Protein backbone atom coordinates (compact mmCIF):
# COMPACT_ATOMS: atom_id res chain seq x y z
CA UNK A 1 0.00 0.00 0.00
CA UNK A 2 2.88 2.36 0.78
CA UNK A 3 4.33 1.75 -2.68
CA UNK A 4 1.09 2.94 -4.26
CA UNK A 5 0.78 5.98 -1.99
CA UNK A 6 4.42 7.01 -2.47
CA UNK A 7 4.53 6.32 -6.21
CA UNK A 8 5.98 9.05 -8.43
CA UNK A 9 5.65 8.55 -12.19
CA UNK A 10 8.94 8.49 -14.08
CA UNK A 11 9.56 9.91 -17.52
CA UNK A 12 10.52 6.45 -18.75
CA UNK A 13 6.99 5.21 -18.01
CA UNK A 14 5.49 7.49 -20.68
CA UNK A 15 6.31 5.46 -23.76
CA UNK A 16 4.76 7.99 -26.13
CA UNK A 17 6.97 10.79 -24.80
CA UNK A 18 9.97 8.46 -24.81
CA UNK A 19 9.48 7.77 -28.51
CA UNK A 20 8.41 11.34 -29.27
CA UNK A 21 4.96 10.53 -30.62
CA UNK A 22 1.33 10.96 -29.66
CA UNK A 23 -1.31 8.50 -28.44
CA UNK A 24 -3.09 8.91 -31.80
CA UNK A 25 0.05 7.96 -33.76
CA UNK A 26 -0.11 5.01 -36.10
CA UNK A 27 2.19 1.99 -35.86
CA UNK A 28 4.18 3.29 -38.84
CA UNK A 29 4.76 6.62 -37.09
CA UNK A 30 5.84 4.84 -33.91
CA UNK A 31 8.29 2.66 -35.85
CA UNK A 32 9.73 5.70 -37.65
CA UNK A 33 10.26 7.54 -34.35
CA UNK A 34 11.81 4.43 -32.81
CA UNK A 35 14.31 4.09 -35.67
CA UNK A 36 15.40 7.71 -35.32
CA UNK A 37 15.90 7.46 -31.56
CA UNK A 38 17.48 4.02 -31.73
CA UNK A 39 20.11 5.29 -34.18
CA UNK A 40 20.92 8.19 -31.84
CA UNK A 41 21.50 6.06 -28.73
CA UNK A 42 22.43 2.62 -30.07
CA UNK A 43 24.96 0.91 -27.75
CA UNK A 44 27.20 -0.08 -30.68
CA UNK A 45 27.64 3.58 -31.67
CA UNK A 46 28.36 4.69 -28.09
CA UNK A 47 30.33 1.88 -26.41
CA UNK A 48 31.74 4.23 -23.74
CA UNK A 49 28.30 5.45 -22.63
CA UNK A 50 26.83 3.14 -19.97
CA UNK A 51 23.37 4.73 -20.17
CA UNK A 52 23.11 4.00 -23.90
CA UNK A 53 22.25 0.35 -23.22
CA UNK A 54 19.60 1.30 -20.66
CA UNK A 55 18.05 3.94 -22.93
CA UNK A 56 18.04 1.57 -25.89
CA UNK A 57 16.31 -1.12 -23.81
CA UNK A 58 13.61 1.37 -22.75
CA UNK A 59 13.08 2.37 -26.39
CA UNK A 60 12.88 -1.29 -27.41
CA UNK A 61 10.31 -2.01 -24.70
CA UNK A 62 8.24 1.05 -25.65
CA UNK A 63 8.25 -0.01 -29.30
CA UNK A 64 7.20 -3.58 -28.46
CA UNK A 65 4.29 -2.43 -26.28
CA UNK A 66 3.04 0.31 -28.61
CA UNK A 67 3.29 -1.74 -31.83
CA UNK A 68 1.22 -4.61 -30.44
CA UNK A 69 -2.49 -3.71 -30.55
CA UNK A 70 -3.46 -5.62 -27.39
CA UNK A 71 -0.60 -4.41 -25.21
CA UNK A 72 -1.07 -0.86 -26.53
CA UNK A 73 -4.74 -0.93 -25.53
CA UNK A 74 -3.76 -2.10 -22.02
CA UNK A 75 -1.05 0.56 -21.82
CA UNK A 76 -3.44 3.30 -22.95
CA UNK A 77 -5.97 2.15 -20.34
CA UNK A 78 -3.31 2.29 -17.61
CA UNK A 79 -2.04 5.66 -18.80
CA UNK A 80 -5.49 7.28 -18.96
CA UNK A 81 -6.49 5.89 -15.57
CA UNK A 82 -3.48 7.66 -14.00
CA UNK A 83 -3.03 4.85 -11.52
CA UNK A 84 -0.23 5.40 -9.06
CA UNK A 85 1.61 2.18 -9.83
CA UNK A 86 4.11 1.17 -12.51
CA UNK A 87 2.80 -0.31 -15.75
CA UNK A 88 4.46 -3.69 -15.03
CA UNK A 89 2.61 -3.93 -11.72
CA UNK A 90 -0.63 -2.94 -13.47
CA UNK A 91 -0.06 -5.71 -16.03
CA UNK A 92 0.35 -8.24 -13.21
CA UNK A 93 -3.04 -7.38 -11.69
CA UNK A 94 -6.01 -9.59 -12.37
CA UNK A 95 -8.55 -8.39 -14.93
CA UNK A 96 -11.22 -8.13 -12.24
CA UNK A 97 -9.23 -5.42 -10.46
CA UNK A 98 -8.76 -3.51 -13.73
CA UNK A 99 -12.47 -3.71 -14.52
CA UNK A 100 -13.50 -2.43 -11.12
CA UNK A 101 -11.62 0.79 -11.85
CA UNK A 102 -13.32 1.50 -15.20
CA UNK A 103 -14.76 4.76 -13.88
CA UNK A 104 -11.32 6.25 -13.35
CA UNK A 105 -10.27 6.20 -17.00
CA UNK A 106 -10.16 9.45 -18.96
CA UNK A 107 -11.49 9.35 -22.49
CA UNK A 108 -9.20 9.08 -25.48
CA UNK A 109 -8.24 12.20 -27.42
CA UNK A 110 -10.50 13.20 -30.29
CA UNK A 111 -9.14 13.15 -33.81
CA UNK A 112 -8.49 16.57 -35.30
CA UNK A 113 -9.55 15.43 -38.79
CA UNK A 114 -12.37 13.10 -39.62
CA UNK A 115 -11.40 10.31 -41.96
CA UNK A 116 -14.25 8.12 -43.14
CA UNK A 117 -17.19 10.43 -42.47
CA UNK A 118 -16.45 12.65 -45.46
CA UNK A 119 -16.43 9.81 -47.97
CA UNK A 120 -19.91 8.68 -46.93
CA UNK A 121 -21.48 12.12 -47.14
CA UNK A 122 -19.95 12.87 -50.51
CA UNK A 123 -21.20 9.58 -51.94
CA UNK A 124 -24.86 10.37 -51.20
CA UNK A 125 -25.15 13.41 -53.50
CA UNK A 126 -23.26 11.52 -56.21
CA UNK A 127 -25.83 8.74 -55.99
CA UNK A 128 -28.68 11.23 -56.35
CA UNK A 129 -26.97 12.85 -59.34
CA UNK A 130 -26.51 9.51 -61.06
CA UNK A 131 -30.20 8.70 -60.52
CA UNK A 132 -31.16 12.03 -62.08
CA UNK A 133 -28.90 11.36 -65.06
CA UNK A 134 -30.49 7.93 -65.52
CA UNK A 135 -33.98 9.40 -65.55
CA UNK A 136 -32.95 12.00 -68.11
CA UNK A 137 -31.34 9.35 -70.33
CA UNK A 138 -34.03 6.72 -69.88
CA UNK A 139 -37.08 8.99 -70.15
CA UNK A 140 -36.64 11.70 -72.80
CA UNK A 141 -39.91 13.44 -71.94
CA UNK A 142 -39.24 13.68 -68.18
CA UNK A 143 -40.52 16.90 -66.75
CA UNK A 144 -40.08 18.73 -63.43
CA UNK A 145 -43.33 17.27 -62.06
CA UNK A 146 -41.96 13.74 -62.38
CA UNK A 147 -38.69 14.84 -60.78
CA UNK A 148 -40.64 16.20 -57.78
CA UNK A 149 -42.29 12.83 -57.35
CA UNK A 150 -38.84 11.20 -57.12
CA UNK A 151 -37.67 13.35 -54.22
CA UNK A 152 -35.73 11.52 -51.49
CA UNK A 153 -37.89 9.71 -48.98
CA UNK A 154 -37.70 10.61 -45.32
CA UNK A 155 -38.69 8.65 -42.23
CA UNK A 156 -41.58 11.08 -41.70
CA UNK A 157 -43.48 9.59 -44.66
CA UNK A 158 -45.85 7.75 -42.33
CA UNK A 159 -46.84 11.09 -40.84
CA UNK A 160 -49.56 12.79 -42.76
CA UNK A 161 -51.19 16.09 -41.90
CA UNK A 162 -54.58 14.58 -42.80
CA UNK A 163 -54.29 11.90 -40.11
CA UNK A 164 -55.35 13.46 -36.77
CA UNK A 165 -53.62 10.71 -34.74
CA UNK A 166 -50.17 11.36 -36.17
CA UNK A 167 -48.04 14.29 -35.07
CA UNK A 168 -47.53 16.88 -37.76
CA UNK A 169 -44.26 17.66 -39.44
CA UNK A 170 -44.14 20.89 -37.52
CA UNK A 171 -43.89 18.91 -34.28
CA UNK A 172 -40.82 17.07 -35.51
CA UNK A 173 -38.87 19.84 -37.18
CA UNK A 174 -40.50 22.96 -35.84
CA UNK A 175 -37.27 24.95 -35.60
CA UNK A 176 -35.96 23.72 -38.92
CA UNK A 177 -39.08 24.56 -40.91
CA UNK A 178 -39.79 27.93 -39.32
CA UNK A 179 -36.38 29.49 -39.81
CA UNK A 180 -35.32 30.46 -43.32
CA UNK A 181 -32.38 32.57 -44.44
CA UNK A 182 -33.51 35.51 -46.48
CA UNK A 183 -31.55 37.34 -49.10
CA UNK A 184 -33.47 40.54 -48.47
CA UNK A 185 -31.87 43.58 -46.92
CA UNK A 186 -32.03 43.50 -43.12
CA UNK A 187 -34.85 45.40 -41.52
CA UNK A 188 -34.36 48.54 -39.47
CA UNK A 189 -35.15 46.60 -36.31
CA UNK A 190 -32.48 44.00 -37.10
CA UNK A 191 -29.94 46.74 -37.85
CA UNK A 192 -30.64 48.40 -34.47
CA UNK A 193 -30.29 45.06 -32.71
CA UNK A 194 -26.94 44.33 -34.35
CA UNK A 195 -25.62 47.79 -33.48
CA UNK A 196 -26.70 47.48 -29.84
CA UNK A 197 -29.16 50.35 -30.18
CA UNK A 198 -32.01 48.35 -28.69
From Swiss-Prot:
It is found in: Cytoplasm. Probable co-chaperone that participates in the proper folding of biopterin-dependent aromatic amino acid hydroxylases, which include phenylalanine-4-hydroxylase (PAH), tyrosine 3-monooxygenase (TH) and peripheral and neuronal tryptophan hydroxylases (TPH1 and TPH2). Residues 114-177 are annotated as: Disordered. Its main location: cytoplasm. Interacts with HSPA8. Interacts with TPH1. Interacts with TPH2. Keywords: Acetylation, Chaperone, Cytoplasm, Phosphoprotein. The modification N-acetylmethionine is found at residue 1. The keyword Chaperone applies. PROSITE patterns: DNAJ_2. Residues 116-125 have a biased composition (Polar residues). Disruption phenotype: DNAJC12-deficient mice show hyperphenylalaninemia and central and peripheral serotonin deficiency, with reduced levels and activity of PAH, TPH2, and TPH1 in liver, brain, and pineal gland, respectively. Residues 126-156 have a biased composition (Basic and acidic residues). The modification Phosphoserine is found at residues 160, 166, 182. CDD domains: DnaJ. InterPro entries: DnaJ_domain (IPR001623), J_dom_sf (IPR036869), JDP1-like (IPR029827). Highest levels of expression are detected in kidney, pineal gland, and raphe nuclei in the brain where it localizes to serotonerigic neurons. Residues 14-79 form the J domain. This is DnaJ homolog subfamily C member 12. One of its GO terms (cellular component) is cytoplasm.
